[in-house]
């Protein structure tokens, strides 16, 4: 079926109507099709990818109409432009489907953050460590922030010892992505990644 068929004696080339809201919107197509192609001659490719040579645009449109397909301009910058006979609606559907599948296959890594203090008590430490192990086992990246307040800034070694303790407790299930060498602002950050 032709993509640019006349509907109620109007072409739906660029202006289309949203059925749910009834509002008009303008869709932008990446490819010119059928009568939109302004070149006088085109390099024509058939349905199965067979090269049909350089033909006048009228003949190319006639061949596409004969097969009840669309003539789609694939490469407008080449001389003469490359056009292919295909079902444009099906082409857009398959392209959209493959884009959705690629997005679905992408692995999204979420970063979870847990805040510590240099003098975090053992009970709080165990609870936070349990949360860290749960996040790492679920495949999430973990950011550990160690915040310093007031005179705690003088005791950097206590903070570094705390981060080393966290690393040693989680070494079976995680690996270190970045370990802080210095205090940035009033905090040190450690990033752990789950082992694969």
UniProtKB/Swiss-Prot annotation:
Its main location: cytoplasm. PROSITE patterns: IF3. Signal peptide: none annotated. One of its GO terms (cellular component) is cytosol. The keyword Cytoplasm applies. GO terms for biological process: ribosome disassembly. One of its GO terms (molecular function) is translation initiation factor activity. InterPro entries: T_IF-3_C_sf, T_IF-3_N_sf, Translation_initiation_fac3_CS, Translation_initiation_fac_3, Translation_initiation_fac_3_C, Translation_initiation_fac_3_N. It comes from the Bacteria. Belongs to the IF-3 family. IF-3 binds to the 30S ribosomal subunit and shifts the equilibrium between 70S ribosomes and their 50S and 30S subunits in favor of the free subunits, thus enhancing the availability of 30S subunits on which protein synthesis initiation begins. Monomer. This is Translation initiation factor IF-3. The gene is infC.
